[in-house]
Amino acid sequence: YNQDINLFKEKQSYQKGIYLVADFINHNYNREIKIEEMAQLAGLSKNYFGSAFKKALGETPHSYLIKIRISKAKVLLETTDYSLSDIAQKIGFKKASSFTSQFKASTGIIPSKYREKSKKQY
């Protein structure tokens, strides 16, 4: 019985760290975030962190970061006239080409077409 309680507490503890990292990503998506930094924040080893994150949130830290960045990009595409390279930089991509390919991989459409479509809806 005590063993079960300890396992439960351990699970709660690591999940708390994972949610802390998810929140950290939500606030720091616009800069480079290294896996070591995330693991340290979660209080887990670098090797264990990725699988613990995926177990808790259903996706890898990298795919979570990309999802957040693409979500922020959509807002900027819909509400501003920033250039694609400005948007790429604002959401943490070093190159506009990387942003464009990630955006297309995530949404099925390139950013400029997404912007066009969103402008037509208003």
Residue ranges and their predicted role:
Residues Y1-D4, N28-Y29, T80, S118:
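A general structural signal marking secondary-structure boundaries and capping sites
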Residues Y1-K9, S13, G17-L20, Y48:
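An amphipathic alpha-helical interaction segment
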Residues D4-F8, L57, K120:
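N-terminal intrinsically disordered/low-complexity leader segments
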Residues E10-Y14, H27, A42:
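Residue-level marker of regulatory loop/turn positions in helix-turn-helix DNA-binding domains and
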Residues K11, L65-K74, K113-Y122:
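Short, basic, alpha-helical segments at the C-terminal edge of helix-turn-helix-like DNA-binding modules
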